[in-house]
């Protein structure tokens, strides 16, 4: 669907300010966009994640974002144990696309992360179960604990493009309509110079009995690369600062509680999200693994509440969420529908933590 010529002025205004990163309501299902130190923090040997977000579905489909990522542990034995449990090493990569204005403005990203997770302290009596599922050896874990620190570094490549074929300009107006075959005179706007961006993060982890906690901080775009359709060195991609945390615990032999939250700040804009999910163990065996039903709810700043429903079947997981808008944005959009779909596939192996979280 062709847009009106006024769209170009909106695009110019948008790129004249510091651009912001696309994000997901299911931030917990997109760990590589939250903290590079979360790379290879997996309940398994490796992990593939695919996220899709469609915001305000309807005529023109204003916003659409998708990712696919792969991360894994390295320097492991055949059984999935690290050669050196005192230092765990992992790598990962991600590709992302983001479209807005009915697909006229397109952004593509690729990133690579590396992480090292170092044991700070291990109290005798603590023994990691190694399974992704609910079973705990209380005799070994009752008095034990472990503390670890993860350090992650990342490098990303970004490129934005304006598809002029999906826009109409004043030069194309014939008096009775728009002739898209006519020149626009705006070819200089179609391409933005690619950029490289650096990121870094830390994650502190604490495990004891049937409780696991992660606390992390990260900074993206440390080098603040230039990003604009016009030649203006003052327009750059602002640093994004992230603080996040999560807690997992067993409430019973069949019920797992996971809570988490995130705070992000970029270019003077900040937002937070907090919530949790309850997992119910349905069934499982050595062949197919565990079947766990997950249901939860998150609160996103003053903008939306986000119900979530998912299921884990062995090493495969699917999660679906829907943003229920609570702000005045709901009045501005005729169909303020925003949904996200996440698919996760894990390779069997030793878990990074004692307790299964639905996104690890």
Language-model features, listed with the residues they occupy:
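Positively charged n-region of N-terminal signal peptides that target proteins for export
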Residues: 1-5, 122
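Sec-dependent N-terminal signal peptides
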Residues: 4-15
């Amino acid at each position: 669907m062709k847009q009106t010529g006024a769209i170009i002025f909106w695009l110019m205004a948008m790129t004249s300010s510091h651009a912001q990163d696309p994000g997901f309501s299911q931030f917990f299902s997109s760990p590589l966009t939250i903290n590079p130190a979360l790379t290879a923090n997996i309940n398994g040997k490796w992990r593939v994640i695919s996220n899709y977000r469609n915001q305000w579905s309807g005529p023109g489909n204003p916003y659409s974002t998708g990712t696919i990522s792969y991360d894994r542990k390295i320097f492991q034995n055949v059984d999935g144990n690290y050669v050196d449990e005192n230092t765990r090493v992992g790598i990962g990569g991600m590709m992302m696309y983001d479209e807005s204005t009915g697909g006229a403005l397109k952004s593509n990203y690729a990133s690579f992360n590396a992480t090292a997770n170092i044991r700070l302290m291990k109290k005798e009596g603590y023994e990691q179960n190694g399974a992704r599922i609910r079973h705990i050896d209380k005799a070994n874990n009752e008095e034990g604990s472990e503390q670890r620190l993860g350090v992650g570094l990342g490098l990303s490549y970004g490129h934005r493009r304006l598809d002029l074929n999906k826009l109409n300009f004043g030069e194309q107006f014939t008096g009775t309509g728009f002739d898209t075959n006519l020149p626009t005179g705006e070819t200089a706007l179609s391409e933005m110079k690619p950029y490289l961006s650096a990121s870094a993060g830390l994650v502190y982890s604490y495990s004891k009995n049937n409780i696991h906690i992660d606390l992390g901080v990260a900074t993206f775009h440390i080098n603040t690369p230039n990003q604009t359709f016009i030649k203006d060195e003052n327009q750059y991609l602002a640093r994004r600062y992230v603080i996040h945390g999560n807690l997992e615990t067993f409430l019973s032999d069949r019920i797992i509680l996971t809570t988490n939250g995130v705070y992000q700040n970029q270019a003077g804009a900040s937002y937070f999200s907090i919530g949790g999910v309850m997992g119910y163990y349905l069934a499982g065996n050595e062949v197919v693994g565990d079947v766990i039903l997950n249901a939860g709810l998150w609160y996103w700043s003053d903008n939306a509440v986000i119900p979530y429903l998912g299921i884990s079947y062995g090493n495969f997981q699917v999660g679906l969420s829907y943003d229920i808008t609570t702000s005045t944005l709901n009045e501005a959009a005729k169909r303020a529908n925003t949904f996200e779909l996440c698919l996760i596939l894990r390779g069997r192996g030793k878990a990074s933590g004692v307790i299964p979280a639905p996104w690890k």
